[in-house]
């Protein structure tokens, strides 16, 4: 029997299931089984993790800039991000191996479902002139990566304490074997893909 740490379940009622996860179980799984003809429920693609990455190239010149990225990702994802460091020294960019050049957080479990729910229902609709996500940014194995130009569309980021606008990359890792399966999964979950 596994137990979860009390700090992770604080403020949640017993038996709590995130809204998007519940929707996945009740609506998306039957729809995908019908669409692709899966015989077993375990064959249906699901979400594994979401990686939020914020590259801060200017941190090579000013080390304090990385703190803003760490603060923003922590507010958006609800967990402390890891610092990405340079692997090689590149003289043209005034970069030395080991310098902090970005921050990233890997979100799994219920936090992942809650993050995606907030992103799809609150953050993406706040983007000005938003025409939808590109349906072509799959990696060949059902995983989807897209970029956002600024972090202010998330309600968790305090706009008064914002030092600068930072873009971010978000990767959604799935168990889908093909891009078509991954695209169908994300479309059923509510990802607003553009029609070509």
Swiss-Prot record:
Pfam families: Ribosomal_L5, Ribosomal_L5_C. One of its GO terms (biological process) is translation. InterPro entries: Ribosomal_uL5 (IPR002132), Ribosomal_uL5_bac-type (IPR020930), Ribosomal_uL5_C (IPR031309), Ribosomal_uL5_dom_sf (IPR022803), Ribosomal_uL5_N (IPR031310). GO terms for cellular component: ribonucleoprotein complex; ribosome. It comes from the Bacteria. GO terms for molecular function: rRNA binding; structural constituent of ribosome; tRNA binding. Keywords: Ribonucleoprotein, Ribosomal protein, RNA-binding, rRNA-binding, tRNA-binding. This is one of the proteins that bind and probably mediate the attachment of the 5S RNA into the large ribosomal subunit, where it forms part of the central protuberance. In the 70S ribosome it contacts protein S13 of the 30S subunit (bridge B1b), connecting the 2 subunits; this bridge is implicated in subunit movement. Contacts the P site tRNA; the 5S rRNA and some of its associated proteins might help stabilize positioning of ribosome-bound tRNAs. Belongs to the universal ribosomal protein uL5 family. PANTHER family: 60S RIBOSOMAL PROTEIN L11-RELATED. HAMAP family: Ribosomal_uL5_B. Part of the 50S ribosomal subunit; part of the 5S rRNA/L5/L18/L25 subcomplex. Contacts the 5S rRNA and the P site tRNA. Forms a bridge to the 30S subunit in the 70S ribosome. NCBIfam families: PRK00010.1. This is Large ribosomal subunit protein uL5. It comes from Acidothermus cellulolyticus (strain ATCC 43068 / DSM 8971 / 11B). The lineage of its organism: Bacteria, Bacillati, Actinomycetota, Actinomycetes, Acidothermales.
């Amino acid at each position: 029997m596994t137990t979860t740490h009390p700090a992770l379940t604080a403020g949640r009622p017993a038996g709590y299931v995130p809204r998007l996860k519940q929707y996945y179980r009740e609506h998306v799984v039957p729809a995908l089984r019908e669409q692709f003809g899966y015989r077993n429920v375990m064959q249906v693609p699901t979400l594994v993790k979401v990686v939020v990455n914020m590259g801060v190239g200017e941190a090579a010149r000013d080390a304090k800039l990385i703190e803003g990225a760490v603060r923003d990702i922590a507010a958006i994802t609800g967990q402390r991000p890891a610092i990405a460091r340079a692997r090689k020294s590149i003289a043209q960019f005034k970069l030395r191996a080991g310098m902090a050049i970005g921050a990233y957080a890997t979100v799994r479990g219920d936090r992942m479902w809650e993050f995606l729910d907030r992103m799809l229902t609150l953050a993406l609709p706040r983007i000005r002139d938003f025409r939808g996500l590109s349906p072509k940014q799959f990696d060949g194995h059902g995983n989807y990566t897209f970029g956002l130009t600024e972090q202010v569309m998330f309600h968790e980021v305090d706009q008064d304490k914002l030092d600068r606008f930072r873009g971010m990359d978000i990767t959604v890792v799935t168990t889908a074997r093909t891009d078509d399966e991954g695209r169908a999964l994300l479309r059923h979950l509510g990802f607003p893909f553009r029609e070509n």
